[in-house]
Amino acid sequence: MKPDIASTLASLKDFQRATVDYVFERLWLAEDQVKRFLVADEVGLGKTMVAKGVIARTVEHLWDTDKRIDIVYICSNSQIARQNLGRLNVVKGFEVRHADRLTLLPKVTQSLRDQRVNFVSFTPGTSFQVGSSGGAYAERVLLYWMLAACWGAAVTGAAY
């Protein structure tokens, strides 16, 4: 079901609505469009609400032309991401997916094909830090099966 943009936008304060309109204009309508936009403000001034408004306007804008709309949410930590994803979901009835680690996204991508609107989140602390760790167990299992599928045989771990 198409999101109720009017109720989403009506819940915003005037300065939040002005920000939503400006961001949407720059992302989708301006002659000199941008591909990304950072909204930075003091704690408690409604950045999440602004994001919800931008998402609502974007989903409405793409609804008639795109078969699938993917919303990717990058947040400072996993707990906040899980909390905010429910708030950002402007299309009720669509499941929110959270991939704790970027490398685990393939575990949820198959189900993304079945939905019109998808919400996926990542957290930099788990997705984007590179170190000497072997990664999470689930990552190693996923990589094993991906390599096995590519090579058409069981991966033994033996040196080649």
Task: Please provide the spans of the model-predicted regions.
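Extended charged low-complexity segments that act as oligomerization/scaffolding linkers
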Residues: M1-Y160
